[in-house]
Amino acid sequence: MARYIGPKAKLSRREGTDLFLKSARRSLADKCKLDSKPGQHGRTSGARTSDYGTQLREKQKVKRIYGVLERQFRRYFAEADRRKGNTGENLLQLLESRLDNVVYRMGFGSTRAEARQLVSHKSITVNGIVANVPSQQVKAGDVIAIREKAKKQARIIEALSLAEQGGMPSWVAVDAKKFEGTFKQVPERADIGGDINESLIVELYSR
């Protein structure tokens, strides 16, 4: 399955909520009707969505938020299920610990897609070592930094400025002047927030 490269707003409308695929700081709510499906008049249906359909939609939504494809998502779920504790929370913590997501959370990219591109283009280091795998799992204490050659990129400077205005998550510590941040700890479920019902995904894979 190829990665979706079409209009990002369409995905948010399909899920009925802003997935922040365009920007973490600018909501789509004022630009398009998130409560109507894609299409000129929005798709309507009188049929009630089945439990399976609801669970599937939730999985699709989370996959789109984090930019993860099906096979990789299944691997994340399998790992989350093997770990102790709540499987749904484990899943979200694994996704939040991805390098591209941490780069995004630190404000170096305005979207996860942009953060993923920074990693793929070798603009990021982890503990001083160049990293180019977006799915790399970041561990507590790891230091993420922008490479010297990329520090003058306007998109990084703008994204970081907007992130500073909006506030950073409590589980990262960012030094904007040095273009680096520390992954303090794996976030707790309450720290992740978002319009996500991970229990629906657990129910889906438990069928």
Swiss-Prot record:
The keyword RNA-binding applies. Pfam families: Ribosomal_S4 (PF00163), S4 (PF01479). Keywords: Ribonucleoprotein, Ribosomal protein, RNA-binding, rRNA-binding. One of its GO terms (cellular component) is small ribosomal subunit. Disulfide bonds: none annotated. Residues 42-53 have a biased composition (Polar residues). Residues 31-55 are annotated as: Disordered. Residues 97-160 form the S4 RNA-binding domain. GO terms for molecular function: rRNA binding; structural constituent of ribosome. It comes from the Bacteria. Coiled coil: none annotated. Part of the 30S ribosomal subunit. Contacts protein S5. The interaction surface between S4 and S5 is involved in control of translational fidelity. Belongs to the universal ribosomal protein uS4 family. One of the primary rRNA binding proteins, it binds directly to 16S rRNA where it nucleates assembly of the body of the 30S subunit. With S5 and S12 plays an important role in translational accuracy. This is Small ribosomal subunit protein uS4. It comes from Burkholderia multivorans (strain ATCC 17616 / 249).
